[in-house]
Structures are given as structure tokens and as C-alpha cells.
Amino acid sequence: MIRPLFATALAALVLVPLCARAEDEPPVPATITFVVSSGFWEELPDAEDDAEEATAPQAARRGYYKLVAERQPDGTALVHLQQIEATPDGPKIASSTVLEEFSALKPYVTDIRPENSAGITIQPGLFATVYLKTDPAVAEPESWTVLIDDLGDIKVERATN
């Protein structure tokens, strides 16, 4: 009698944490349809800051860009641009913004692709193509480019092929 009761209690102790984990939020929300990490950015410390803190020189901040398409309840998407900083503790979001140029179109995003998939870029910045439809019934998507130059200026425009 005690042995089956003990086995049941032990099974409950093992299964309760598993059930709790199943109810936790997923690591990537279901509304995220596309994510592309590409390009890179770097911020050098200001010379004025170095003069004030001569005993502790600051390292340059570095990282990469991420474009994220997030599906909205009406089926259209928001396109987020994030700067991800590479830190000793791992990546962290340095900045995040919704690209209003896409929001104004109320797009149905069908794909996002980086300039190259090698993972290596020579110049700082980002070049990626967002494929979208403004009417879901249209067969072919439009191509839009997101360009960030070496100074950090962002340009979103329809691709010209």
C-alpha cells in the first residue's frame, strides 16, 4: 500500500515541473513570422569621455542588426529593426524600433532576406530585402530594401530591379 502511494507521489513530483514548463511562454512568440540577423555596427567611445576617464578606457560597442516581421491580428505585419549589442554576457537589444515606412503600407510580409547568407560583411551597415504584398490576392510580392549605411542612416525604399 505504501509503495504504490510513494510511486504516485514521486511521479507527481517529477511531472509537476514538466507541466509548469509546458505552460510557460514560448521563446519565440507565434506572431513572429520572419527574423533575419545581418550586417554589423560599431560605436567608438567619444574622445571627450576618454579624457575624463583616463584610468578606465571604454571599449567600442559592437553588434549586428536584426529585422523582425511580426504578424498583427488583421494578418498584416509590423517590421521591427533592432540593434543587437554583443556583450560579454551575451547578446542584448541596444535599440528597437518599428519601421513606419512599412507600417504605412499595412503589408503582408512574405519573406525577409539578407544581402548575403555568408554571415560576413566587409562594410558596417545592413542591406536586406523585405518581400511583401499590400493585397494578399496579388500573386507576386513587391521587393523593398532596408539599407543602413556606415553612419547608421536608415533608408527604406521600393527595390528597383
PLM features: residue spans?
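Positively charged n-region of N-terminal signal peptides that target proteins for export
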Residues: 1-4
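Exposed acidic/polar residues on beta-strands and adjacent loops within beta-sheet cores, strongest
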Residues: 21-161
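Bacterial N-terminal signal peptides
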Residues: 7-17
